[in-house]
């Protein structure tokens, strides 16, 4: 199937959450994902069948091959460098596998939308956040070292990334 045919058959997702989930397997909870919820009606992988897990991985791989460039995957990998130990999602391994076979680019907001949803509550201190920002070149304001202030920063950043991702996907006709 040629690339144009694949594009013409792109599904229309009912919400930004499902669209991001299908594209990146973005977890909604520690062991769950938007796509697993959409596929199984559950809140995590625990209630999914083996076939559903395989189907989810296939969707993520397809989306990454279609929409991410090697440069985008390097950005994702840099972000994951700080969270590999806590990762329970196969996206880390998929990104390594797919890195050299991705034909085209995707806006950075897509990457941010995924990463912020996945790791907002895993970043425990401002020092980690500052290092993350320096390594990726993504500016994140630092309000202070108290946890409440850090949470406010992360929540504001997460909301902005999701708004950007939703607008882009709406413009492309991927969500209603």
Where are these predicted regions, by residue range?
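N-terminal interaction/assembly modules
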Residues: 1-74, 78-105, 125-142, 147-176
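Short, leucine-enriched amphipathic alpha-helices that occur as contiguous helical runs
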Residues: 72-73, 108-117
């Amino acid at each position: 199937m040629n690339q144009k045919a694949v594009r013409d058959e792109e599904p229309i997702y009912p919400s930004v959450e499902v669209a991001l989930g299908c594209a990146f397997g973005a977890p909604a909870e520690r062991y769950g994902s938007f796509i697993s919820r959409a596929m199984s009606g559950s809140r995590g992988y625990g209630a999914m069948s083996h076939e559903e897990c395989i189907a989810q991985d296939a969707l993520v791989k397809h989306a990454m091959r279609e929409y991410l460039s090697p440069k985008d995957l390097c950005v994702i990998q840099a972000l994951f460098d700080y969270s590999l130990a806590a990762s329970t999602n196969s996206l880390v391994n998929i990104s390594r596998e797919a890195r050299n076979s991705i034909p085209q680019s995707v806006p950075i907001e897509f990457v941010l939308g995924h990463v912020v949803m996945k790791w907002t509550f895993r970043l425990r201190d401002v020092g980690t956040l500052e290092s993350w920002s320096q390594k990726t070149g993504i500016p994140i304001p630092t309000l202070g070292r108290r946890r409440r202030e850090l949470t406010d920063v992360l929540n504001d950043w997460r909301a902005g990334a999701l708004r950007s991702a939703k607008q882009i996907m709406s413009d492309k006709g991927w969500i209603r």
